[in-house]
Amino acid sequence: MKKTIVLYLLCICHFHYSHSQAMSSKNYTYLALGDSYTIGEQVATRDNFPHQTVALLAKDNFSFQQPVIVAKTGWTTDELQVGIALAALDKKYDFVSLLIGVNNQYRGRDKAEYAQQFEKLLKQSIQFAGNIPEHVFVLSIPDWGVTPFAEGRDRKQIADEIDAFNSINKDLASKYNVHYIDITPGTRQANNDLSLLAEDQLHP
C-alpha cells in the first residue's frame, strides 16, 4: 500500500491525544487486524500502513516493537475471527487497529451479519488493548469502486454499499468509544489520480 498521508497523520494525532502524558521511552506494542488493506497488497512489508505508522511515530521519539499483523487478502469479518482464533496472539497490546469489511461488501454479504460480526471483533480488539477503548482505532473501508478493477461495474452502487458498511462500523466505534479514522474520502481521490494505487490498480 502506498503512503496515505492523511491516514498516517491522523494516527499520529490520535496517538498523541490519547497518550499525551505517556513516557516516550516505552517500547509500545501494536496489533493490526484486517484484510488486504492492512497487509498492504503488492507492496513491501515496510510500506504497509501498520509499519509506516510505527516508522512515523518513531520519528517523534515513540518506540514500537514490530507490528503484529493478523490479516489476509480476501478475508471477511468471519474469516478474520477464525484468523484471530488460530493466531498465537499475546493477551494484551498497547494499541490495536481494525479495518475489515470490503470483502463482505464485495461478496454481497448481509449488513446485519456484518454488524454482528464486526461488533464481536471490536470487543475483541478492546480486550486486546487491555480494555482501554482509547487505544483502539477503527479505520473505514476504502472505496474500490473508483479503481480500474471496478471497470464495467456500477460504481455508484459500490460507493453506496461501502458507505452503508462504513455507517455500521462508525456507529459501533462510537458506541464503544474507540477512535474512528475515515480514510474513505482519501481513497476516492484515486478516481482522478491512479498514482495513489498499488501496481494491481486496486489497493491504495
Segments the model singles out, each with a brief description of its role:
Residues 82-204:
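Alpha-helical cap/lid subdomain in secreted, periplasmic
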Residues 79:
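Short acidic active-site motifs
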Residues 8, 34, 100:
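Residues that line or immediately flank small-molecule/substrate-binding pockets and catalytic motifs
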Residues 20-73, 83-91:
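Serine-esterase "nucleophile elbow" of acetyl-processing enzymes
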Residues 1-25:
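Bacterial Sec-dependent N-terminal signal peptides
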Residues 15-16, 48, 195:
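Residues in and immediately flanking transmembrane alpha helices
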